Structures are given as C-alpha cells and as structure tokens.
C-alpha cells in the first residue's frame, strides 16, 4: 500500500513484470517500460495513473485487473505481442474508459457488476483477445461514440483500428467468431451510440448467441453490426430499441426468440445477411417500419409480393420502408 510515483525512468529486462502493484496509489509518467514478460501488472483495489509512457518489446504491455481504478493518457506501445491495456475480471465501481494510443484488450470475461456503470468515451477502441472473451453486463454500459469518432468493439487481429495490436503483421486476419459477445443480463441496460461492433458472435450455447445477446434493455443508435458470427443481435428477454443502425453480413441479422421480448428497429439498414434480416419466433409483433432492406421493393416475405430485399420471417411490421417512395438508398446515419 501507500503511494508510488515513477517519472522519467527506464524499467527493462524483467523476467516477470517490470512493475508489479497489488495495492495503493501508483503514478507512472514519462517513462520507458521495456523487454519484460509484462511491462506492468496491477491488481487489487489499486489506483493507477499512466501518462506519456512508452512500452517497448514486452510480451504484454500492461496487465490490469478490472478492480483497479485506472486513468491514462498519451501512452504508446512500439513492439511486443499484446500492445494494449489487457483487462479482465470484475468492474466493481463506476468506471470511465477513454481513448489512448493503446487499445483496451478484453481477455476472458470482463464483468460489469450490478449497480455499477462502465462508460466508454468517443474514440476508445476495445479489442477482444480470443473466442472466450466477452463483455458481461449486469449493471449499465454507456457507449458514447460520436459520428466522426466512434467506439470500436473488434478482434485483437483487426489491424485496421489501433494498428497491429498482436504484433504479427498479417499472419492472422480478423474473422467472424473471433470473440464472444456483449451479453446483457436480466436487469442490465446498454445505451450504445455511434459504435462499430464486428468479428464477434462465437458461441456454442444459445444463451450467448449474437454479437449482442440481450436479456436486459438495449438502446442501439447510429451504429454498425457487421461480420459477426451466426447472429448480429439475439434477444432472449427484455427490450431493444434500435435506430439508425447498419446490420449486415451475419447468418441472421436479428432474432427475437421468446414472448417475454419486445423489439423495435427504425431508420436502419438491414441487408446482406445470409438467411434472414429479422426472425421473430415470439408471439409479439416487431415494429420494423421505415428501414432499408437492400432494394426499393422492400423485404422478401410472402405478404410483400415482388419484394426483392433482405428476407424476414415471422410477425413483423415492415411497411412503409425506406425506398418505397424515395430513391434507392440506405438511411443516412447521424
């Protein structure tokens, strides 16, 4: 415990962690942390501040347990194989994630416990380390992206955002099912605005289906779900309100599975999903009016003769649709 301040230092060549912290307050600034298995390793109910540091040639740049109260700015990782802030475990307080030159890397389950809120600010990049990595929400998730500064949820193998985080150039490429899901448990709330969610959706169990699996309350706006596994959104319970969002390149775009679920989707683009854009297996009606289905003729469904757009299945309101009386276009996301 206590307070440690490290400034203008070089810490290198440690077999385990260059800096290891289990409690207290630690501030590291203007330093180089290099050539160690883990540049830093911080756990427990600690307070950690990282500003203006360079991580170089560590296997893992920074290993940070989710219980740590962590703030940071202007840090870089020049080499190594896990070039970000690797985070896992239980978020036990209201937590703020902000952008940096290094992404957050979720490894395993990251749990937002009931009564706590994880807020993610514009420009933050979250990469998931492997197919058993997920964001497991029992409290509240607020994603506050902006039109020109979105929040990304993507694969560790995705070099298009935040660069080559796993340090292997093009040896691995991102693909569907690289990570699990954003799971909303009963009583959880997610307000997701201006986010890109891709390459997730891995699961062997229906309780985790979808890049977003909703048993709580989901408000999804101005976002894009694309290139995830079998399902973009799989809803088992609760409510979803979706607006101005692209849902494409899944096997099924949206699935509403039970009678305890309610879902609306408007002003969105639902297209290029392999089987159906929306499947409603519940007795409730899905209000999916004023959406773009990939063609002026509207969705493909028996009640819409001549419809050539994305197919839908079940009790779904789809008329009017974008393109019915206007030029062939997708909605503008704002």
Question: Residue spans of the language-model regions?
Answer:
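Beta-strand/loop edge motif enriched in small/polar residues
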Residues: 1-330
């Amino acid at each position: 415990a206590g307070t440690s301040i490290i400034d203008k230092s070089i810490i290198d060549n440690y077999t385990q962690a260059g800096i290891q912290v289990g409690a207290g307050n630690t501030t590291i600034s203007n330093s180089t942390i290099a050539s160690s298995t883990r540049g830093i390793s911080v756990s427990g109910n600690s307070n950690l501040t990282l500003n203006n540091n360079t991580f170089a040639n560590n296997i893992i740049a920074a290993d940070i347990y989710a219980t740590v109260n962590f703030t940071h700015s202007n840090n870089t990782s020049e080499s190594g194989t896990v070039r970000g802030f690797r985070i896992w475990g239980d978020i036990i307080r209201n937590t703020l994630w902000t952008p940096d030159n290094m992404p957050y890397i979720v490894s395993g389950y990251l749990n937002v416990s009931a009564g706590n809120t994880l807020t993610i600010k514009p420009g933050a990049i979250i990469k998931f380390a492997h197919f058993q990595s997920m964001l497991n929400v029992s409290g509240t998730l607020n994603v506050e992206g902006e039109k020109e500064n979105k929040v990304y949820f993507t694969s560790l193998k995705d070099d298009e955002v935040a660069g080559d985080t796993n340090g292997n150039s093009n040896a691995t490429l991102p693909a569907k099912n690289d990570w699990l899901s954003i799971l909303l448990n009963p009583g959880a709330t997610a307000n997701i605005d201006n986010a890109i969610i891709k390459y997730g959706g891995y699961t062997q169990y229906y309780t985790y289906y979808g890049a977003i699996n909703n048993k709580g309350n989901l408000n999804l706006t101005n976002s894009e779900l694309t290139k995830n596994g079998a399902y973009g959104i799989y809803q088992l319970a609760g409510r979803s309100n979706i607006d101005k969002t692209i849902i494409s390149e899944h096997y099924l775009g949206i699935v509403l599975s039970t009678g305890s679920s309610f879902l609306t989707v408007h002003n969105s683009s639902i297209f290029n999903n392999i089987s159906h854009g929306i499947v409603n297996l519940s007795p409730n009606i899905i209000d999916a009016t004023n959406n773009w289905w990939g063609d002026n003729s509207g969705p493909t469904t028996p009640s819409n003769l001549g419809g050539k757009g994305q197919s839908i299945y079940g009790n779904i309101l789809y008329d009017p649709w974008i393109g019915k009386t206007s030029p062939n276009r997708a909605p503008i996301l704002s």
